[in-house]
Amino acid sequence: MAAQQTYRLFEVALKERRVLSPSLDRMVFTGADVARMKTEGPDQRIKVFFPLPGQRVPQVPSGADWYRRYRALPDDQRPPMRSYTLRQLRAEQGEVDVDFVLHGETGPASRWAIHARPGDRVLLLAPDADCADSSEGWEWKPPVGVGQVLLVADETALPAVAGILEELAARVDPPRTLALLEVAQAGDAVRLKAPATAELVWLPRGRASYGQPLLQAVQARLAAAPGGVAGEALEEIDVDTQILWEQADSHLAGPLYAWVAGEAGAVMAIRRHLLRACGLDRRAITFMGYWRQGRVLD
């Protein structure tokens, strides 16, 4: 018997657009099957398929081997697909929220988001509530009893960080948390629900290169090991040909747990500083290249 798929496709329609900041809009989607969707973590990843010109709904193959056949479609017949965070799910109401970063018409996702109107349709590849197995589509898995949390993210990972902070705020005894958050401009510093033990540092990028404010903040707040004592030898990852994705050991008992996500080149530089210069335990840090400047990862 074939294994049950942990993800399935959901056809949804845009119900409402909520402007969160100059660069961030929340799309509220609705669909008859959303009641069968589930989320397993505050940084739950999903895929969004966008219609090609002339399509009302993205045309994606069905069946067990749909993804292979989707990838085999000619470029002009393959609906664009991008990764997003499932921000909030109200399954009983048939609603799901996805936050979109707006960066002009440079890509199909932002272009769709800029022009989207209520009733416009997309497909979501999201965890199937009918499947008892885990989707494994999230990485926020801190060890029990961790005392310090470090969150490092650019605006593409801000929806995930918002969910993480909400989870921490709901705890009786939340850990001390430092969140370094790079955004396009000062107006993107949205209000987030966070525990009293959290410090949120907003880093407007302005004209700086992607990830530069984030790297500088990490270097300023987490100094290199004293006396030049370096961490373990660190292999380099070519972020132009490989996906930078390293998950922490959720069973490791240690004082610090870090979650780092954003532009892959910046995450690579932050990884180098935290592990090589600061000598932190790589088993306590999750590194994720959510995107790579000049390259499509999906």
Where in the sequence are the language-model features?
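Extended, composition-driven regions rather than compact fold-specific motifs
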Residues: M1-D298
